[in-house]
């Protein structure tokens, strides 16, 4: 479960509409239907002021667009990522969503650093661009509107807005409402074409971990690279993959997963990354 470690702070006193929304949300015991969630987002757009500020344990201040006030940071991930991303680092944020960590990576890497954020969902990219803009890190963040997979081409992608559940659709998953065609690339192909040697890679791709790993064998073999990946075992079966396949791919690459907290089982934990270490 992701725990919020940031402290939300408004630039202005909440309006009557915001307070009313908060009371209504607090009274609900079931997840809101999509239409109601969308109405809530539109109402937030009408509020005075366009963002909030979260202050994290290290003193970082992250401006958050009002409609994305749900953003949170896991304390173990926050600490591990901060330790890995040093000034001047080149960071690949694979599955950046609306940029909760993209913005932090950019702050930590500094003006001499570089963050490349991959995100294929048009709606989510809009939130990502907004957070890059209002946090004044556009000079060091490049947004790539593509899904990272095992190779170049196109794929079906299930858009779930900015909920964090956006995902590539399995080959036999069929086509449904909300599914679009997106461009795909692999980390190996992308890095080779740009002459990139990343310092840190964060992967959070909602069940597509195996394809990303397969398409990154050369990149992940580079020395001195910090690698983090979030596993999604609850949806592997729906994507037609197994734990054994992922374990086999990691073994082939000479990697093994290590939890960010000693109490966690790397194969049965979601909502937090694991670190991939060289054998």
Predicted segments — roles?
Residues 144-146, 185, 230, 260-262:
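Conserved beta-strand termini and adjacent loop/short-helix elements that scaffold enzyme active sites
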Residues 2-131, 136-140, 174, 191-194, ...:
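S-adenosyl-L-methionine
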Residues 103, 125-126, 166, 210-214:
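Alpha-helical elements of the RecA-like P-loop NTPase motor core of helicases
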């Amino acid at each position: 479960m992701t725990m919020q470690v940031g402290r939300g702070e408004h630039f202005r006193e909440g309006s009557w509409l915001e307070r009313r929304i908060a009371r209504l949300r607090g009274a609900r015991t079931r997840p809101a239907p999509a239409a109601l969630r969308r109405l809530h987002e539109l109402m937030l757009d009408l509020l005075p002021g366009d963002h909030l500020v979260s202050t994290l344990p290290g003193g970082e201040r992250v401006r958050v667009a009002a409609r994305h006030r749900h953003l949170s940071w896991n304390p173990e991930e926050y600490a591990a990522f901060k330790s890995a991303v040093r000034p001047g680092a080149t960071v690949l944020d694979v599955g950046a969503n609306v940029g909760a960590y993209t913005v932090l990576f950019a702050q930590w890497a500094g003006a001499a650093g570089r963050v490349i954020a991959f995100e294929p969902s048009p709606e989510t990219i809009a939130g990502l661009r907004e957070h890059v803009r209002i946090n004044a890190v556009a000079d060091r963040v490049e947004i790539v509107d593509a899904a990272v997979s095992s190779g170049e081409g196109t794929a079906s992608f299930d858009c779930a807005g900015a909920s964090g559940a956006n995902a590539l659709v399995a080959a036999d998953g069929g086509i449904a409402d909300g599914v679009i065609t997106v461009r795909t690339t692999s980390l190996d192909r992308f890095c080779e074409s740009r002459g990139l040697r990343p310092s840190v890679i964060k992967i959070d791709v909602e069940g597509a971990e195996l394809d990303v790993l397969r398409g990154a064998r050369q990149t992940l073999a580079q020395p001195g690279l910090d690698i983090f990946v979030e596993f999604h075992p609850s949806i592997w079966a729906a994507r037609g993959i197994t734990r054994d396949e992922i374990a086999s791919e990691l073994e082939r690459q000479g990697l093994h997963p290590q939890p960010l907290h000693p109490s966690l089982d790397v194969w049965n934990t979601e909502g937090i990354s694991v670190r991939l270490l060289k054998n």
